[in-house]
Each structure stands twice: as C-alpha cells, then as structure tokens.
Amino acid sequence: YTVSHGVDPSGKKVGNGFSKYIVTDLLRNRYGYNGVVCTDWGITHDYSSIEEADGKCWGVEALSIPQRHYEALKAGVDQFGGNNDKGPVLEAYRMWTAEFGEKSARERFERSAIRLLLNIFRTGLFENPYVDPDRTEATVGNPEFMQAGYEAQLRSVVLLKNRAGTLPASTRRSV
C-alpha cells in the first residue's frame, strides 16, 4: 500500500511491491533476507469502486493485471496477496520467458517455490499432515495466546503523523 518516495535511486515511483530497489536491492541483498516476500493485499487488481479496493497498484495502474504480476516478480516478490487466480501468474511466466528465456523463468519461479515450500516443510506438514483435534482445540482461541497476540499488536503500533500532538506523551495524559 506504500510508495517510498525519494528512496529508489532510479527515480521510479511505484508501490513497494513493484520496486526492485526495495525488494531485491535493499531487503534481499543489503539486509540478507531470504524468506518469502508477499505483496500487500490486492495490489495487482483493478477496482471499479473505492468500497471494494483493498490495495492499490501505485505507479503501474496503466499496466494489465498480468503485467503487474510480471513487474512484481521482476522486483523479487514470491507471492501475491489477495490473488487466487493462476492466470495472471502463468501469463507473467510467459512474459519472463519471452524476455529472459525459459531457463531464467524456471529458475526464478523455482526460487519462489523453494521459499514458499520451506515454510511448509519447517512446520512439519509433509511429515504429519493430520490435525490432532484435541491439541487444536487447546491451542486455537486459547485466551493466553490471544492476550499475548493482542499485547504484541499494541506494542507494534506506529504513529505515522503527529498532527494532534500525541507525542511526546505526557505522564498525566491518557490516550
């Protein structure tokens, strides 16, 4: 949902999910991240009304949906948030093949597949794919876990604009 203005040395003004500088140059190369990169939700979609828009394809609005997928893949993205349609992804594969060749396309898609599958292997879903209903019932919705999650969310709140003078917080002021 974000565009990091003035950050990309190329001057491109695109959403971060379409930015090779953000995803590959910074996140992967500079900071060494090798996990899955999933786009913000719905940034490859077209929307006919603001009510249905959950993401925006900033900077690539003029591109087709398959072209947006292709641009995100070239940026280094592995997974498309909010997209359950394989069509644009397969078309992006064909675009990659046309530009860089079949070998390069396979290598690029396999790199993403490895990252995605590693998460499934690490959780043991291939070794033991069966759910233990008793254990699940004790875990899912566990009040202690829900409280810990809620507290983690409270600690992760970020103030983007300080228009109302919220910060610095006074010890005598309640928020």
What is each residue range found by the language model?
Residues 1-175:
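Glycoside hydrolase catalytic-domain context in secreted enzymes
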